[in-house]
Amino acid sequence: MMNSYEKFHLKEVINASGKMTILGVSKVSEAVLAAQRFGGEHFFEMSELSVQTGAFLANLLKAEDAQIVSSASAGIAQSVAALIGKGSLYHAYHPYTEKIEQREIVLPKGHNVDYGTPVEVMVAQGGGQVVEAGYANMCSPEHVEMMISEKTAAILYIKSHHTVQKSMLTVAEAAKVAQRHKVPLIVDAAAEEDLFKYTEAGADLVIYSGAKAIEGPSAGLVVGKKEYIDWVRLQGKGIGRAMKIGKDNILGFTQAVEEYLAHGSESGASMQERLKPFVEAINNLSELTAKIVQDGAGRDIYRASVKVDGRKTAKEVIQALKAKSPAIYTREYQANNGII
């Protein structure tokens, strides 16, 4: 039988980058595939499936409630819309109505990043208006506090390696500001590995990607306060209709969360051991110097960092690797500094 690479004339890819959206993120387990297959072969009352899988996951994650959505980006848009509409069916049908003025989403300036699309695009899709707090290189609780007004619908905090890491308030600090002003706090923790800490830190809604740390199918998860999750679920009658997720991925994702909580992700120590032979081999080559480095966002993730000091620049090496078949994809964020 012809495989998909042959059938669609696709280039094979070696993923040396990580769980990246542009490469299809991650591989799923046999149990997840079996759950997806069961979903694909059976019928359900979709509203019941949504509520019951959400309640099941909420119990596992020690949260009030949860809602599976199609992606973390959809989670941002629907969470923003939910906190603007506050359970109003009129709003769900008229998400951008001028009758509702409380639309401002306070976001640390260093968190207003492009992770494949700008954060503010997803906020705008939910009907929100970004109000930046602080500066590109710093944002304190006071910076966030001074931007809150009667038009504030929520505070949004992006926990990601894409964002500025230094001199930024913590999630716990953002939660204290939110609680003091009785404003909900949304935390986008798309690629984060800890499914408990942000709820415990005081976030009202926390968003995860289904296919990154959790290694499930394309999906997203919003966990948090029951009232707010009910409002998120209502968005299925509004903007969420364009972002709906299928029964197969709902069941596959739920299985992936169960497996993730049972087995966890690979430890940083294990990653370092796996990287050692690679780093040693690279260091035997001329014009390249490799070392093991920790993830820039402080997660227990380790990667090989390769410094290019030769006739070709890091950018040229990266492009040459991608041009081959199979294509080899690396992380390119430090290419300007000569690092792969």
Segment roles from a protein language model:
Residues E48-L49, I245, Y333-Q334:
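Short coil/turn segments at secondary-structure boundaries
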Residues M2-L23, K27-V28, G54-L261, V279-N283:
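Conserved PLP-enzyme active-site core in the AAT-like
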Residues L261-Q294:
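Conserved PLP-dependent catalytic core of the aminotransferase class-I/II
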Residues S50, M271, L275, G310-I318:
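Generic alpha-helical secondary structure
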Residues T21-V32, F43-V51:
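A structural motif shared across PLP-dependent enzymes of the aminotransferase-like
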Residues S4, E287-I340:
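Conserved C-terminal alpha-helix-loop-beta "cap" of PLP-dependent enzymes
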